[in-house]
Structure formats: structure tokens, C-alpha cells
Design a protein with these regions (language model features):
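Conserved beta-strand-loop-alpha-helix junction that forms the acyl-donor binding cleft
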Residues: 119-129, 147
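Conserved GNAT acetyl-CoA-binding A-motif
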Residues: 109-121
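A short, internal acetyl-CoA/4′-phosphopantetheine-binding micro-motif in the GNAT/acyltransferase core
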Residues: 83-94, 121-122
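Conserved acetyl-CoA-binding loop-helix of GNAT-fold acetyltransferases
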Residues: 88, 94-107, 134
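C-terminal "cap" of GNAT-fold acetyltransferases
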Residues: 145-191
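A short beta-loop-alpha structural element at the N-terminal edge
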Residues: 1-20
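Acetyl-CoA-dependent GNAT
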Residues: 23-78, 84, 89
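Conserved acetyl-CoA-binding loop of GNAT-fold acetyltransferases
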Residues: 133-143
């Protein structure tokens, strides 16, 4: 029986089970040469990474089959959340688990009064890109982070409508300009 649980500063958070899930879920990415740091996280790194955020965890009976983290941030008086560590057990993929977790993620985002959600994924993580587009995220930047050996798409999902975001972030020319600049002047490892 599938169920979704949300953890926030809880001693019951199943960190070890989530660590095992991340390792399993990102094995295919590692084989493709996409080295997600989450795939090798320890329990302590998981705890530290999310800090005061939320883990949304999917269970099939007592087995952890999916997870995603919501991390709250604020900059210039704007509250936003990051959508991180999305993972589904490979044997459970394409069963709607990520979509169910995202519905819970949105509920939590509304509860914590966030303005928008930001997420990133590797340029070649095709299933992740499909997931983001299917769930209403809009591509707004193409970047190369110093901490990753690959190019990344940045996605945004608005919770509240902002004129500034509507006209600057969702503007296709902004994405195209960032794509061209990154491909011309940046290496995949931001070098």
C-alpha cells in the first residue's frame, strides 16, 4: 500500500533508508557518467543538507520507494523553496510516485508560504527533465555549477504571481541567452 509521509525535524526521519534509496536510484545516472553528489551521501550529509527543511517520503508498505526534499530559503525578502534529492526506486518508476510526492511537496510549499520553487537537473538527466515539465516547472536558466561536472537546467515553479518573475524569468530570451553564454564560455565543470 502506497503512502506519503512528511518529515520536518523529526527523530523518525528514515535517513538510512533514504540513503540506500538515493544510492539505488542514482546508480543508472552514475553509469551514464552523471555524478550526482546525493548518490554518495552519508546519513550525516543528508541531515546537514536539508537542515530545517522537509523530507517527503513515499512508502510501499514499509519500504521507502521515493523521496524529495523541500528546503526553504529567503533572499531580498522573497521566500522560495528548492526542490532537491528527488529519487524513486528504479523498480517503482513510472507508477506515479514522483507525481504523488510532488502534490505533497506543493501542499507543504503553500503551508510554509513560499513564493516559488526552484529545481535543477543535469542536462542529460532526461527522465528528470520530463518530470519537471510534466509537473508544470518552467525552464529559466542553463548553467554550469562549480560543484558539478555537467551542465544543468534550472527550473522554476511559481506559487505566487510576481510581475518581475513573469516578465524576466519566464522570458524565453533569458533562457536562450544563458544557454548560449554557458555553452560558449563555460565548461561542464564551470571551468
Amino acid at each position: 500500500m502506497l503512502r506519503i509521509e512528511t518529515y520536518h525535524n523529526s527523530p523518525d526521519t528514515p535517513y538510512e533508508k533514504m540513503r540506500i534509496l538515493l544510492n539505488s536510484a542514482f546508480q543508472e545516472r552514475k553509469e551514464e557518467g552523471i555524478d550526482f553528489a546525493y548518490a554518495t551521501y552519508t546519513v550525516e550529509q543528508l541531515k546537514e543538507h536539508v537542515g530545517n527543511g522537509f523530507y517527503i517520503v513515499a512508502y510501499d508498505n514499509d519500504t521507502v520507494v521515493g523521496m524529495v526534499a523541500l528546503i526553504q530559503k529567503e533572499r531580498y525578502g522573497i521566500r522560495y523553496s528548492t526542490h532537491e534529492c528527488l529519487a524513486v526506486l528504479p523498480s517503482m518508476s513510472n507508477k506515479g510516485i514522483a507525481t504523488l510526492m510532488f502534490q505533497t511537496f506543493l501542499e507543504v510549499a503553500h503551508q510554509v508560504d513560499t513564493d516559488f520553487i526552484i529545481s535543477t537537473t543535469a542536462e542529460k538527466a532526461y527522465s528528470s527533465i520530463r518530470y519537471h515539465k510534466k509537473n508544470g516547472f518552467k525552464t529559466f536558466l542553463f548553467v554550469s555549477f562549480p560543484s558539478t561536472p555537467y551542465y544543468s537546467y534550472c527550473f522554476i515553479y511559481p506559487i505566487r504571481k510576481f510581475k518581475l518573475l513573469k516578465y524576466s524569468v519566464f522570458n524565453k530570451p533569458v533562457f536562450v541567452a544563458s544557454y548560449v553564454f554557458t555553452k560558449l564560455f563555460k565548461k561542464e565543470n564551470n571551468g
